[in-house]
A protein has these predicted regions:
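TRNA-recognition modules of translation machinery and tRNA-sensing kinases, especially anticodon-binding
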Residues: 1-450
Length: 450
């Protein structure tokens, strides 16, 4: 029996990983341009961390977590989201002691859900968190940052929804109102909603059951219960977004699926990916650090689904630079192969960022040249017994009608660098300089492969 991937956990093959890498690189560069630093946290955490942070009466904790006992009979969970782990790391290492933090992380998350387009049991997220900031200015920055990503990636068909969940006192009053409302229609509630009515009625608003939507639509609205400070916070956030030219709509039913949120919550969604349209979502969680044992620390963050982001990038016609080599070395014979290894490393030293593929596994000149053409390389570097004896190499353009040139090895790096640069300047290069940046060139050629 052949091994197969677990349902809902997908391989990202080479033809797709280039798109992932391109999208992730742009997202990372935007995040770091706002002063956020990367943190890496474990995939496995103690189960209690998620029960305390996400909330016992949530779909994630009740139905979706991958939880098991390790060899010490300790309950551990494969992280369903990253915020709790980042907060735990901050508490463990004293990152919140009289200091503010701007952090981001990325990696796989795990939830036992029904697999469908845009929803998987192993999925990838990029998370950005700002700890120690209480004002609406950082809320605005995080939302504006995400909008900058859409612009850099050339994405469209995204809409932003906002809401405020207010303070703990706001939620207490609103909870009483919800209990009164849903208790009056209890006979119409589904089983999950009846249970949530007793434990956490706000979770009813997050129900995906179509039969519940009409009841939810008529429920009281959180915004009508906001305390003055929360209302002012929300109003100032909207002023900042208006000033930045960010379009949004206020959705009073937006509550998010995690219990730790308060005040600002938001979601970027698209209609381009079917029912799983949320691309990026988050909110403020001012009480979570203290709840998990740290000092009182205001905080806000968002999470972005990479699979959905890549899917939207493709739906919007996004193009990824070709990742093929610049040069394919055709080496016929053992002496030529030895020389090919020598030349390839010398060229990598001379031209920073150059991509070279050396033919391995032998083959005739004709078969190797076919491989060179199939690789997408701009040039074939031809080596045979004659070239080895004369300390020269054949430089054959593969994307133009130019003739093959014989180049002395001592001049090869300069000649090749010049040709690659001319191809870029003339638009013949299969990668554009602004899409494939590398570091400065070696002094030998004064050229950096872009």
């Amino acid at each position: 029996m052949k091994p197969k991937a677990i349902r809902g956990m997908n391989d990202v093959l080479p033809e797709a990983s280039g798109t992932w890498r391109f999208v992730e690189t742009i997202v990372r560069e935007v995040i770091e341009s706002y002063g956020y630093q990367e943190i890496r946290v474990p995939i496995l955490e103690q189960t209690e961390l998620f029960r305390r942070s996400i909330g016992e009466v949530t779909d994630i904790v009740e139905k979706e977590m991958y939880t098991f006992l390790d060899r010490n009979e300790e309950s551990v969970t494969m992280r369903p989201e990253a915020t709790a782990g980042m907060v735990r790391a901050g508490i463990s290492h004293g990152l919140f002691h009289n200091q503010r933090q701007k952090l981001w992380t990325a990696g796989p998350m795990f939830r036992y859900e029904k697999p469908q387009r845009g929803r998987y049991r192993q999925f990838h997220q990029i998370d950005v968190e700002a700890m120690g900031y209480a004002g609406p200015d950082v809320d605005a920055e995080l939302i504006i940052m995400s909008a900058r990503m859409w612009q850099e990636l050339g994405l469209s068909r995204l809409v932003l929804e906002l809401n405020s969940l207010g303070s703990l006192e706001t939620r207490r009053k609103y909870r009483e109102s919800l209990v009164n409302y849903f208790s009056a229609v209890k006979s119409k509630l589904d089983e999950d909603s009846i249970r949530r009515l007793e434990q956490n009625p706000l979770r009813i608003l997050d129900s995906k059951n179509p039969d519940m939507q009409e009841l939810i639509a008529d429920a009281p609205i959180m915004l009508d219960y906001l305390d003055d400070e929360s209302a002012q916070h929300f109003a100032e956030l909207k002023v900042l977004l208006d000033a930045a030219g960010i379009s949004y709509s206020v959705n009073p039913r937006l509550v998010r699926g995690l219990d730790y949120y308060n005040r600002t919550v938001f979601e970027w969604a698209t209609d381009a990916l079917g029912s799983q349209g949320a691309i990026c979502a988050g909110g403020r969680y001012d009480g979570l650090v203290e709840k998990l044992g740290g000092r009182s620390t205001p905080a806000i963050g968002w999470a972005m689904g990479v699979e959905r982001l890549v899917g939207l990038f493709e739906e919007c016609g996004g193009k990824v630079p070709d990742a093929g080599p610049d040069v394919y070395i055709v080496a016929v014979g053992q002496a030529a192969l030895v020389r090919g290894f020598e030349i390839s490393e010398n060229l990598r030293e001379a031209i920073t960022g150059i991509r070279i593929e050396l033919n391995l596994g032998g083959g005739s000149f004709k078969s190797q040249l076919k491989r060179a053409d199939k690789s997408g390389a701009e040039f074939a570097l031809v080596l045979g017994d004659d070239e080895v004896a004369e300390n020269r190499a054949g430089l054959k353009p593969l994307r133009t009608d130019q003739d093959q040139a014989s180049v002395a090895l001592e001049h090869l790096a300069v000649e090749l660098a010049g040709r690659l640069r001319r191809n870029e300047d003339s638009g013949l290069d299969h990668r554009s300089a602004d899409q494939d940046p590398v570091s400065t060139a070696k002094k030998q050629t004064g050229y950096t492969r872009a």
